[in-house]
Regions:
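Activity-critical C-terminal alpha-helical subdomain
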Residues: 214-221, 315-362
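Short acidic/histidine-rich active-site segments
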Residues: 302-309, 344-345
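Amphipathic alpha-helical segments in well-structured domains
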Residues: 177, 285-289, 325-329
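Short, amphipathic alpha-helical segments
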Residues: 47, 234, 238, 286, ...
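Hydrophobic, well-ordered secondary-structure elements that form the walls
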Residues: 270, 307, 337
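Residue-level signal for pocket-adjacent positions within structured domains
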Residues: 32, 48-51, 198, 225, ...
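C-terminal substrate-recognition/cap domain of FAD-linked oxidoreductases
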Residues: 55-61, 65-284, 293-295, 299-300, ...
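FAD-binding subdomain of flavoenzyme oxidoreductases
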Residues: 1-114, 339-349, 353-362
Length: 362
């Protein structure tokens, strides 16, 4: 597959073979249901849920690679692929923002994005506590300035934001970071710009290693990635995150969890640790999954931004998109794979019962 101009598409559709049939059927599917697909598409910057039918045809280019990418091997097999890469900037500085109150989060994220950070990450107070507990001797002395700063600004932060700014020179990267910090001064929150790559590394280490700390340091519990990739519009974060935390609160004695992710996108990764040998604890998973995904959908988000559906999220696609759009996913599967050979029970045909039957119990 490759992007096709309109005249190339017409040529493909004239083919009297399986490939020609795919192009004819998919063209009819997306053009006849264009309004439905447009309305169903979540208003977020990343979305891996379902089939990306809305990306195939823009009126000028017909591109089935955008459908095949992210289809989890359910439509066929990729034997060769070509990637376009970019050359990263040589220098970077990190703007670190400590939030004691989530109320201004939406405005802070929006204001930071106007300065075009290269990356914009975050982690919550649970992540920071975990790092302080298990990485204390590695980083304790390096965090003395931050400890003093946050103590003066109301104590332990609820959320830490990491905005990375890059440039072709050290001075360019530093100027971008300082300009952004100056632009955020009105929010009256603790923040600082890293002095060097080594200074920034302690923050990245917490973001990067939090999952490994959970897995290796907390005994008797296993990872349970059932709501590990949610995304909502960034402008709703101030309201969404407190509601999300409230859903987990009743189960705080049955799980350990952290929330980290990409603040600029509103994309968060939650991977609880739970004692999966307990039937009572296992019963929490479908109940909490239902509640979290209902909340995400209510805020106009997606149940998966990056990690895709698999057997865990496929049963929730009708809830997210509605029966009509889900029927188009089923039709797409039949067009490409009429015998249901490729990776069944993903994207379509999955049930909660099937997913739960594959849950670890030890």
């Amino acid at each position: 597959f490759r992007p096709l101009l309109a005249f190339e598409l017409r040529k493909k559709m004239r083919q009297a073979d399986f490939e020609g049939g795919i192009y004819r059927d998919m063209y009819c599917l997306v053009t006849e249901n264009a309004a439905l697909l447009k309305a169903a598409r979540p208003t977020v910057s990343k979305n891996s849920a379902g089939y990306a039918l809305w990306d195939i045809w823009d009126g000028k280019i017909f591109d089935l690679t955008k459908l095949f990418t992210g289809s989890q091997g359910t439509l066929g097999m990729i034997t060769e692929i070509e990637f376009k890469t970019i050359r990263p900037k040589k220098h970077s500085r990190l703007l670190v923002i400590f939030l004691n109150d989530l109320a201004p989060l939406c405005d802070i994220v929006a204001a930071t994005l106007t300065h075009h950070p290269e990356s914009f990450e975050s982690y919550d107070n649970h992540t920071l506590w975990l790092a302080m507990r298990y990485m204390l001797f590695r980083f304790a002395w390096q965090f003395i300035p931050e400890i003093v700063m946050v103590a003066r600004n109301g104590g332990f932060p609820q959320l830490v934001l990491l905005a990375e700014f890059t440039g072709d020179s050290k001075s360019e990267a530093l100027l971008k970071a300082r300009t952004a910090m100056h632009g955020l001064a009105r929010f009256k929150c603790a923040m600082r710009v890293s002095n060097s790559a080594k200074d920034a590394e302690k923050y990245w280490a917490i973001r990067r290693e939090s999952f490994n700390l959970l897995r290796t340091k907390i005994k008797g519990r296993q990872t349970a990635p059932f709501v590990d990739d949610i995304i909502v519009p960034p402008e709703s974060l101030s309201q969404f995150l407190p509601e999300l935390n409230a859903l987990f609160t009743p189960y705080k004695n049955d799980m350990t969890y952290t929330i980290a992710g990409h603040a600029g996108n509103g994309n968060f990764h939650i991977i609880p640790l739970m004692d999966l040998s307990s039937a009572r604890v296992r019963r929490i998973i479908p109940m909490l999954t239902d509640a979290v995904y209902a909340l995400v959908i209510r805020y106009g988000g997606s149940i998966t931004a990056e990690h895709n559906d698999g057997i865990v999220r496929t049963p929730y696609l009708p809830q997210m998109y509605g029966a009509e759009v889900y029927a188009l996913f089923e039709k797409t599967k039949r067009i490409f794979d009429p015998q249901n050979i490729f990776n069944p029970h993903k994207k379509v045909g999955g049930t909660k019962e099937y997913a739960l039957s594959h849950m670890r119990t030890e």
